[in-house]
């Protein structure tokens, strides 16, 4: 994770709770933090997309996730989003792939830049 304090950006190992600091996660940190949550919810597959996947995240970037699992329904997705936001201290945009139209721009973004951050078969 990166901590930003003024103009200096440093790698920080662990979590920082002081609200005056903002941070940008690297993908490996995101994977480590979300793994136990996805294990608990028994999610099959998750893609990271958007600014974090493109390595263009800023201090105010949210984290965009796409769940590829037909058994995760709306109420469970809402609860999952809350747990992820709490663990990451970031806004999360979470999508269920089955609810996105195939010809939509977001669908194309997910599959052109998406990075697997969780797969129940390999975690």
Residue ranges and their predicted role:
Residues 64-67:
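Short beta-strand->loop micro-motif that forms the acidic, two-metal-ion catalytic signature
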Residues 2-45, 53-59, 70-123:
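Catalytic core of pol beta-like nucleotidyltransferases
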């Amino acid at each position: 994770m990166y901590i930003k304090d003024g103009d200096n950006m440093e790698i920080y190992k662990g979590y920082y709770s002081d609200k005056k600091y903002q941070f940008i996660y690297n993908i490996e940190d995101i994977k480590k933090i979300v793994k136990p949550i996805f294990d608990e919810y028994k999610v099959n597959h998750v893609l990271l997309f958007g600014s974090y996947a493109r390595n263009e995240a800023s201090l105010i970037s949210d984290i965009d996730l796409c769940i590829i699992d037909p058994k995760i329904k709306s109420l469970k997705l809402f609860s999952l989003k809350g747990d992820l936001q709490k663990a990451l201290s970031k806004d999360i945009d979470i999508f269920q792939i089955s609810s996105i139209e195939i010809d939509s721009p977001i669908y194309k973004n997910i599959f052109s830049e998406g990075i697997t951050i969780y797969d129940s078969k390999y975690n």
